[in-house]
Design a protein with these regions (language model features):
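Bacterial N-terminal signal peptides
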Residues: 6-17
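Acidic, low-complexity Ser/Thr/Gly/Pro-rich repeat segments typical of extracellular/periplasmic
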Residues: 18-182, 186-189, 194-198, 212-218, ...
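Positively charged n-region of N-terminal signal peptides that target proteins for export
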Residues: 1-5
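Post-kinase regulatory C-tail/linker adjacent to protein kinase catalytic domains
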Residues: 218-219, 233-235
Length: 254
């Protein structure tokens, strides 16, 4: 089984709201099928990536929903790329130079929706590498509220290779993700190594710790790895986890 890191944030309350969009007269069955990717240029998983622009073509007209909140680029960039939807095409234009020999991941979250019903395309991730390989390790876990132990949705989770405490205030995370509605997270496309793991209520959206933001951090170094434990019909199934010596506790910083 995969090992999980359980992260507890101190005194963090996140509010969520929902609206009933089903009231009023109905014009027929609601289209619940999300947009389908028909073509990617360059293709998803490209190696030695050197393009400035990505275009993704869909089978229907699309629109974008709150890209600042829903789209995460890892490693994070200081200058946000320009992301637009025109007709059936989504474009991403980078505003800064990409780092050599680095795996990049664009997680669109629920940002891509069909034009009429706003049905989101979930779990669509575009990855590429500016080097010869796409890093493929990962760390998974869950974030809880320290006050009531409820799972927390929408919290930024990131890793650092720099062990200095000042890195939190001065250096953006190496890789990032957000917790889902049930507090679960997975940081994908990690390279092997030793990392410090953090959960951050990133109110400022700068991928840095600022005074007043709730934060939690692991009390030991984490090392991602891939285990092969289950054998089904002579084919091994990979499971992703963390070093068994890694403790599952995090402390909070106020």
């Amino acid at each position: 089984m995969s090992r999980y890191i359980y992260i507890i944030l101190f005194s963090l309350a996140l509010l969520s709201s929902c609206a009933n969009l089903g009231g009023g007269p109905q014009g027929g069955p609601r289209d619940t099928i999300p947009p389908i990717v028909e073509k990617e240029s360059p293709i998803n998983g490209t190696l030695n990536f050197d393009a400035k622009r990505i275009e993704i073509h869909f089978d229907e007209y699309i629109q974008l929903n709150d890209i600042q909140k829903n789209v995460l680029i890892s490693p994070p960039q200081q200058k946000a790329p320009e992301i637009k939807a025109i007709g059936k095409t989504l474009s991403v234009v980078f505003a800064e130079e990409l780092t050599d020999s680095t795996t990049y991941t664009i997680d669109f979250g629920s940002a891509i929706c069909d034009y009429n019903e706003k049905t989101p395309l979930l779990e669509y991730v575009y990855s590429f590498s500016t080097g010869d390989v796409i890093d493929s390790l990962a760390i998974s876990g869950r974030v809880y509220d320290a006050g009531n132990l409820d799972p927390i949705a929408g919290v930024l989770v990131g890793i650092h290779t720099n062990s200095a405490d000042s890195a939190l205030n001065t250096i953006p995370f190496v890789r990032i993700t957000r917790t889902d509605d049930n507090g679960y997270f997975t940081i994908h496309n990690m390279r092997s190594g030793k990392y410090r793991l953090f959960a951050l209520n990133d109110i400022s959206r700068d991928y840095l710790y600022q005074p007043g933001e709730a934060i939690a951090f692991a009390d030991s170094i984490v090392e991602p790895y891939i285990e092969k434990r289950e054998q089904l019909d002579t084919i091994w199934r990979d499971t992703i986890g963390i070093d068994p010596e890694t403790k599952d506790t995090l402390f909070t910083r106020q």
